[in-house]
Amino acid sequence: NIKQRQKYPNHWSQVQQISLAILHKQYGREFKPMLDHENTNRSYLFGRLLAIFELMELKKYEIENPNKDKKESNRITNAERYWNAYTSQPAKLMMNLVNKIKPYEEAVKLNAHGIFHKLDKERAEIVQLLSPLMAKKDINDPLDYQFIFGYYAEKQFFYTKQEKNESEE
């Protein structure tokens, strides 16, 4: 069950990959691992946002311990800790996570400005896409299967080297 991440501390990557494949086949739609900046599905956007929160915190841990192997770290991020609750009540937990990652943001902003800028730009885009949905009654309803696709795509986007557009140069 992908909503219960804590049950798979050593095998999360495999569970995630299998879940993505099963959901892809079950829903018969084309899901690409590439980030879809046009997707305005509530679950997809909340998945992307959770990935941003997790990446910000992970970068802070990397700054603190640059020589420590990621796999050795037993540190649980707030995104991991609140995963189950977030998938059940995303809008409520989003505000909680925003407050919890503030100290991590400051450290990343000071020590890895480029990474901070990339994550902050992505977050601003997601929040802008979520803004029209925030007034709806169903904003805090449990997330559907598209959540995991948004989460995965955002993380893949972060770890993939991006070519600069002429407008960015």
Located regions from the model:
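Intrinsic-disorder/low-complexity detector
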Residues: 1-169
